[in-house]
Amino acid sequence: MNVYPPFKDKLEILSEDQIFSVLVSFDDLSNRDKFIKKYNRLDIISKFDFIPSILVNLKKEQIFNYESEALIKQIEENQIVYPAMLDVNKILELDDYKKSEISYTGKNVKVGIIDNGINEKIPALSKVSLKKFKLYDVEKPIKENGEISHGTVMASIISNRFEDSDGNYIGIAPNVKIYDFDISNSHQEHSFNDILRVFDKICEEQINLDIIFISLTTKNSSDGKDLLSLACDLLSDKNIIIVCPSGNFGPNYYTIGSPGAAKKVITIGALDKELSISNFSGRGPTLDKRKKPDLCFPGSNILVPITNDLRLNVSGTSVATATGVGVIALIKEYDSNITHDLLMDLFNKSKID
């Protein structure tokens, strides 16, 4: 069976004429290239090397016609991924900041953030070590303090350079090196193929990362066998810790999307101020009945200072995940050799159920 089962179920109830953006994956690059040669009239939008696959637009009939093709490993929908942050409310004037007594600051830890770009010009990110990678050539109007994208908020939670009354940076890991993988585009919508292109870039350019933070998730639940989840598992095998939100589609069970359902990513849910699971936080199990999320961090009504006159009150599992990424960066600074499995052992021994 070559059609990904959740996608096949969806196809059964949709019209014959509808065109789908689909990802076709293969066991290896050789099979992919043989397929392209065999079906040379097929209009291929993109090719991916890290996990051998192509992006094409197909009708329902075409998808089922390819189902018996031996060269194909799997056909699935190129699903849209959504930022896992809820409403943002602007609040004027800053309060005093919580004193930080942590001796580690994430120094020399490399964190890749896959999101819609980071505005490093805001005061909160002043002098943060940041390297930009732009996936698409799209011009965005950048205002010095006005471009507050989802990615900017995520980076501000991790590396905020505002100081508390004792002169400590309030960011959880203010000295990490941030790699900004900006997947923003002209239609302001993101799909699996955007993240797969980032993975190709990381591998092709041999970008050395310790942590990858994917702050996006699908609406549809996943069993961890979709292409993006499988790609995350493969990248994790390169000793990169991948961290994802559980999504904001709770409180029902089976609301973990992709890539949060991947077996080798650390999936994080959100807690409210009383340290109870937030109502919106995605719940497990995954579609194949594995326990997720792996951890929960505070993610409801978190105040994030952006400028001297502006702070944001933010909620969402991506907010909780940014907090988790900061904590993981501190641990990574302490033990640069720690792996995903050892990190999970550490969390499992210290977490409160």
Model-derived features with residue positions:
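Autoinhibitory propeptides
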Residues: 1-10, 32-100
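Short glycine-/aliphatic-rich beta-strand segments at the starts of folded cytosolic domains
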Residues: 8-26
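Structural detector of well-ordered beta-strand residues that form the stable sheet scaffold
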Residues: 76, 179, 241-243, 267, ...
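Subtilisin-like serine protease catalytic core
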Residues: 101-113, 117-131, 142-191, 210, ...
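Active-site environment of divalent metal-dependent phosphoester hydrolases
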Residues: 120-121, 248-253, 274
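Catalytic-core environment of secreted peptidases
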Residues: 125, 130-131, 272-321, 345
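Hydrolase catalytic cores
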Residues: 157-158, 179, 183, 299-353
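Substrate-binding/access-modulating region of protease and related hydrolase catalytic domains
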Residues: 183-263, 287-290, 305-321
